[in-house]
């Protein structure tokens, strides 16, 4: 799932899921994370989330009226701790940084088809710092997000409806590692298919310089 040219990767043989992740990349999984159909709480009209990352902290402010379905999904994911230990697996200078594939293949499998409806454009643009769900086509948004590095107004009206904005710490977002570039198969970066099936073990082994989220928490 991509932020632009947003088709899923073509179907390819998937490596077997490791029986057990190495202790160094083990991901905490709660029972609630495995039941996406119950993560349906309505988000507040406006709320903030603080991301603690390997490069520092940044805060996102969400406005539900910008994109109600997107805001509700994000709110529930944060409450579940879904983004904890997730990697920023696709970062392209001047364009955007993408994240939101859970580090546990078990969890990823449960959410892969937990789609939410598209939100109609509500006057918000994919400007610098805007936070938006990635999509693979109409009504296919699940858990992947991106933060815009530049003005990507060309994405407006294509199903990429921003639901929030980086309120502070954009310098941290700017500093996230971008050296791997575009993901496979178009580029040399991580394969989303392999992240889904192998989780953080694959990323830590083959892309060790990626930055990651330590925690994402709701704040006042």
Regions found by a protein language model. Name each.
Residues 6-220:
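Cyclophilin-like peptidyl-prolyl cis-trans isomerases
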Residues 1-4:
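Sec-dependent bacterial lipoprotein signal peptides
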């Amino acid at each position: 799932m991509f932020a632009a040219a947003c088709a899923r990767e073509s179907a390819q043989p998937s490596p077997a899921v490791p029986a057990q992740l190495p202790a160094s990349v083990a991901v905490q999984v709660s029972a609630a994370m495995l039941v996406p159909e119950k993560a349906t709480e309505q988000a507040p009209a406006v709320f903030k989330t603080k991301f603690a990352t390997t490069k520092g902290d940044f805060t996102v402010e969400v406005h539900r009226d910008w994109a109600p379905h997107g805001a509700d999904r994000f709110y529930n994911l944060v409450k579940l701790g879904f983004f904890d230990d997730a990697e920023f697996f696709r970062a392209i200078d001047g364009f955007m940084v993408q994240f939101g594939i859970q580090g546990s293949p078990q969890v990823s499998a449960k959410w892969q088809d937990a789609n939410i409806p598209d939100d109609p454009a509500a006057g918000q643009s994919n400007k610098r710092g805007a936070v938006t769900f990635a999509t693979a086509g109409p009504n296919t948004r699940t858990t992947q997000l991106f933060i815009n590095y530049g003005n990507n107004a060309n994405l407006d009206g294509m199903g990429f409806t921003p639901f929030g904005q980086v309120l502070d710490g954009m310098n941290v977002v700017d500093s996230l590692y971008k050296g791997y570039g575009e993901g496979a198969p178009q580029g040399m970066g991580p394969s989303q298919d392999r992240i889904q099936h192998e989780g953080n073990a694959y990323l830590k082994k083959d892309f060790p310089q990626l930055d990651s989220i330590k925690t994402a928490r709701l704040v006042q």
